[in-house]
Amino acid sequence: MLSRKARRAAFTTAVLATATAGLSAGPAHAARGHVYVSTNAEAGNAVVVFNRDAKGRLYQGGVFETGGNGAGGNPTFPVPISDSDGMVTLSPNRKLLFAINIGSNTITSFQVRGNGLRRISTVSTGGIGPNAADARNGVLYVTNTGGPGPGAPGSGGPPTGQPTMMGFRYSSGGTLTPISGSQTNLPPVSLPAAIRLDPQLTYLAVTERGANQTQRFPLDAGHVPDTPVAYPVNAGSAHPFALALTSNDVMLTADEGNPPPEGPGGDSRITSYNAATPQTPTPLDSDANSQTATCWIVLTGNERYGFASSALSGMVTSFSLTAQGQITVIGAQPVTDTVATDMGRSRDSKFLYVNSINVDPMALAFKSSRIDIYRINSDGTLALIGKTASSLLGSTSGMAAS
């Protein structure tokens, strides 16, 4: 029987072999940026790096083990994706990358080194079932669902443990240190899906699908959460999932609605709130995108446009956004496979990358995934300009881009 170390080595070799199939190696010196995805594999999680050229095309880079395990499923449904927004995140200066290991209840920090990564540390997230993280100016927070941990991946059903969040300080070199007093309980069975820190580190926000609300926690001088204010989900919507914060405190949520078997689907919405005045937690605006299970949001650098991917519709919606939080849906583009999940955009906001998963609906088998490449037009519309081979694992969860 192979040792754990041998199994991990074999797994990494297999991922590298499949990830490079059908892709040109590309000139290393031509990289203008990168796309990072997490395999979320139960046998050993890893981050796959793609190099981006000036035309937005992606070329396979390396595969870097996290030192932890992914999950064969997630706490909500017996499918091999994280069911969250934020499994992989970059520091604002893009010099550090953080990847969550659901199956090990840990998070790993990497230094970004040219076209590769250097692993720095892997630490406990202080809870069970970590699924989302965000990093800002030396502070990182991570949510824990309280769901099945090691030994019970993909067991299905709602989490039975205590949902929490926990904060860390990270050094310029990537070392993670827990923030004393930061571990905070979230409502039971709240199913946290995303967490975001505001750039000034005065507050953070967490979407809680199971509780049908988003909570805004003020942070004290030591970056410890204080008493939160709850933003109930917009009337006519349900289950806030993805989360984005703008530079002028507009908070956006992607409300997944009631997808099958809970409801008929087609009722997802994008909703905005004023996060600067939590004493009046009512929506600024809400616009239906007529999709099912809208669960991920990415904004352009100037915050004038945004994109929301819908898992069960297999679509990416474009929308415009004003400084006052007014939302207007522009249109939608299909992904090349069945399910649309995590997204990332290039730092110049010229290209959008979307994880597109090939699913066998009869067997509920997530067979493989690829990255679809879209050009972001000046009017916020998208144009599909390429795709990688269907070479990534079907469990791939989390994406960050530079």
Regions found by a protein language model. Name each.
Residues 61-78, 118-124, 177-186, 226-234, ...:
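A short beta-strand motif characteristic of beta-propeller blades
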Residues 37, 99, 142, 206, ...:
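Residue position within the beta-strands of beta-propeller blades
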Residues 49-58, 109-116, 167-176, 217-225, ...:
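Short loop/turn segments immediately following beta-strands, especially the blade-tip
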Residues 364-402:
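Blade-level signature of beta-propeller repeat domains, shared across WD40, Kelch, NHL, RCC1
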Residues 116-198:
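Asp-box/WD-like beta-propeller blade repeats and closely related beta-sheet repeat scaffolds
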Residues 1-29:
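Secretory targeting and sorting signals
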Residues 67-90, 125-139, 148, 184-203, ...:
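Beta-rich, blade/repeat-based domains predominating
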Residues 40-42, 52, 102, 145-148, ...:
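Short loop/turn segments immediately following the C-termini of beta-strands
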